[in-house]
Amino acid sequence: MVAQIIDGKKIAQQIKSEVAHLVQMRIKAGDAAPCLAVVLVGHDSASQMYVTSKRKTCESIGFISLAYDLPNNVSETELLMLIDQLNTNHSVDGILIQLPLPVGIDNIRVLEQIAPHKDVDGFHPYNLGRLCQRAPLLRPCTPRGVITLLERYNINIVGLNAVVVGASNIVGRPMGMELLLAGCTVTITHRFTRNLQQHVQNADLLVVAVGKAGFIPGSWIKSGAIVIDIGINCLDNGKVVGDVNFSEAIERAAYITPVPGGVGPMTVATLIQNTLQACKYRKLS
């Protein structure tokens, strides 16, 4: 068995085209284009790269993109004041704070300062709570992107045993909630989990997000499983790989996401979907 590749680049491009069309329809109807404010603190090269990609994507589909590049020594108070200004700016639909923030700034406090209806990353406790209550509004981008990939490939996951390896607030935990909402029986594993191999071997659907290259051997993959690799790791030779040993896993899985080109593009695609949704909320309110 050789797994079918789940092409995140292709699906992300489809979504961008769909959103661009909806934006043009809004503009023709006399409505404003969606507006996303992206806040970058400091000069982390990886963060700068991600922010540049997000801004270019927004502009390419007709969004208004506002850039707020703050110095590394900005205070938490100053950052919170900027967020308050963006919260009350009626022309701004979405606010994105690029993580990680510098040492000395409380990530949780900053994310909680964003108005829930402008929280296009889906990290605010209100939005996470809505997801837990089976009434999601703005959803965390990477987990929602995974669900979209499965839907676009017509992969039925209802009733499957889903195992999430990694329990981060950004990916693992909301991923578990998304899979539960989709009808899976969900196990979330973490650093204290015993018998990780046994959990992985029982997974009909395996989602891995730990940030460790090749952490899951292909021999652990259940024959015919669906493998979603969210990890992005850069090796010393410059090669980018995931958390799953791809060359081994592809021989056992039924479906698998590559790294790069799998889940990564879907995170940005979901961000623009969320921003358009936030724009619609603003109009309704």
Swiss-Prot record:
Its EC number is 1.5.1.5, 3.5.4.9. InterPro entries: Aminoacid_DH-like_N_sf, NAD(P)-bd_dom_sf, THF_DH/CycHdrlase, THF_DH/CycHdrlase_cat_dom, THF_DH/CycHdrlase_CS, THF_DH/CycHdrlase_NAD-bd_dom. Keywords: Amino-acid biosynthesis, Histidine biosynthesis, Hydrolase, Methionine biosynthesis, Multifunctional enzyme, NADP, One-carbon metabolism, Oxidoreductase, Purine biosynthesis. One of its GO terms (cellular component) is cytosol. GO terms for biological process: L-histidine biosynthetic process; methionine biosynthetic process; purine nucleotide biosynthetic process; tetrahydrofolate interconversion. Pfam families: THF_DHG_CYH, THF_DHG_CYH_C. This is Bifunctional protein FolD. The lineage of its organism: Bacteria, Pseudomonadati, Pseudomonadota, Gammaproteobacteria, Candidatus Palibaumannia. The gene is folD.
